[in-house]
Amino acid sequence: MPIVLPDSSAWIEYFRASGHPSDLELVDLIDEEAELVITEPVVMEVLAGARSESHAIKMRTALLAYPLAKVFGLDDYETAAAIRRACRAGGETVRSTMDCLIAAVAIRESASVLHSDRDFDVIAQHTELHIHPLGA
């Protein structure tokens, strides 16, 4: 099974137990002990939405149970900028530069992204980014 990098949008649905397709897929991947990775921008985005410090600690513990695909400094930031430019050159705008950074890490790690954020679909149209299919 390929490596999957769940975006913060998928983790947020998961922590809310929302029943959203990305929540259900993440539950399945966790139950199947799929190869999941996490990256610093996802940790930051998820923890920023914590309701309290104790909630942040619980979420952090859950997230960091998975291997960390670290951001490789300037290289990944430059790749993220190139991703945003490629999308813009293709006539589409990526709303979040953070999503470009997450995509840069996923591409480098050959990981597919599980998400509920349209930016990743746009990025995948203009780069080598793979999207993890829901219900896979």
Positions of PLM-derived features:
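Acidic, PIN/NYN-like endoribonuclease modules and their adjacent C-terminal/linker elements
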Residues: 1-3, 103, 107-136
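A generic structural signal for short hydrophobic patches within well-formed alpha-helices
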Residues: 11-12, 43-46, 120
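Conserved glycosyltransferase catalytic-site signature
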Residues: 8, 40, 96-100
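Active-site neighborhoods of divalent-metal-dependent phosphate/nucleic-acid chemistry enzymes
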Residues: 68-114
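Short, well-structured N-terminal submotif of metal-dependent ribonuclease cores
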Residues: 1-38, 48-61
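Short active-site oxyanion
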Residues: 1, 32-36, 65-67, 107-112
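Short beta-strand scaffold positions
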Residues: 6, 38, 71, 114-115
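Amphipathic alpha-helical recognition patches that constitute DNA-binding helices
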Residues: 25, 97, 101, 119
